[in-house]
C-alpha cells in the first residue's frame, strides 16, 4: 500500500496569511509569534507571510474567505482566543467561528488551520499560548506547512 503524507518543509513560493484576532490580544499575540516562529524554523521566507488582524473570532471566516478568493494566498493560519464568560456568547461565537473556518477550507480547497483557542478560563488559554500545553499558534502553522506539502504530493 502506498502512503502519501505531507512533510514539515515549507513549499517555496507558497503564500500564507496568518489571520488573527485583536480580542484577547494578550493571548493571541503569543500565538502569532509561535506561528511566525514555526514558519521561519521550517524554512519559510518572511516575504511569503502576511499577517491580517481582525476584531474578533466571529470575523475570521469572512476575512479568510476574502483572502482565499483573491487568489493571492495558498493557505491560511487562523488564530484567536475565545474564553468562556458568564453568558452563552462564548458558545455562539465559538461554534460559528469554528464552522465558518472549516467551510472556508472546503469552499476554496486550500489549507486553513484551526488555531482558535476555545477555553473555559484565562489560565487554560495561557497554557496553550506557550507554557504547559505548548504554543498552539506554532502547531497551527505546522499544520499549514504539512498540508501545503501534502497538496503538492497528491
UniProtKB/Swiss-Prot annotation:
GO cellular component term, pick one? cytosol
Please tell me where (2S)-2-hydroxy-3-oxobutyl phosphate binds in this chain: 86-87, 128
Instruction: Cite the EC number.
Output: 2.5.1.78
Keywords in alphabetical order: Riboflavin biosynthesis, Transferase
Quote the catalytic residue positions.
Answer: 89 (proton donor)
Catalytic activity, as annotated: (2S)-2-hydroxy-3-oxobutyl phosphate + 5-amino-6-(D-ribitylamino)uracil = 6,7-dimethyl-8-(1-D-ribityl)lumazine + phosphate + 2 H2O + H(+)
- Which superkingdom is the protein from? Bacteria
Which pathway is it part of?
Cofactor biosynthesis; riboflavin biosynthesis; riboflavin from 2-hydroxy-3-oxobutyl phosphate and 5-amino-6-(D-ribitylamino)uracil: step 1/2
One Pfam family named in its UniProt record = DMRL_synthase
- EC class of this enzyme? transferase
Q: Binding positions for 5-amino-6-(D-ribitylamino)uracil?
A: 23, 57-59, 81-83, 114
Q: What does the entry give for GO biological process?
A: riboflavin biosynthetic process
What the entry lists under InterPro entries is as follows: LS (IPR034964), LS/RS (IPR002180), LS/RS_sf (IPR036467)
- State the Gene Ontology terms under molecular function: 6,7-dimethyl-8-ribityllumazine synthase activity
Q: Which PANTHER family would you find in this protein's record?
A: 6,7-DIMETHYL-8-RIBITYLLUMAZINE SYNTHASE, 6,7-DIMETHYL-8-RIBITYLLUMAZINE SYNTHASE DMRL SYNTHASE LUMAZINE SYNTHASE
What family, per the record? Belongs to the DMRL synthase family.
Q: What does this protein's UniProt record list under function?
A: Catalyzes the formation of 6,7-dimethyl-8-ribityllumazine by condensation of 5-amino-6-(D-ribitylamino)uracil with 3,4-dihydroxy-2-butanone 4-phosphate. This is the penultimate step in the biosynthesis of riboflavin.
Q: Known HAMAP family for this protein?
A: Lumazine_synth
Tell me the protein's name. Answer: 6,7-dimethyl-8-ribityllumazine synthase
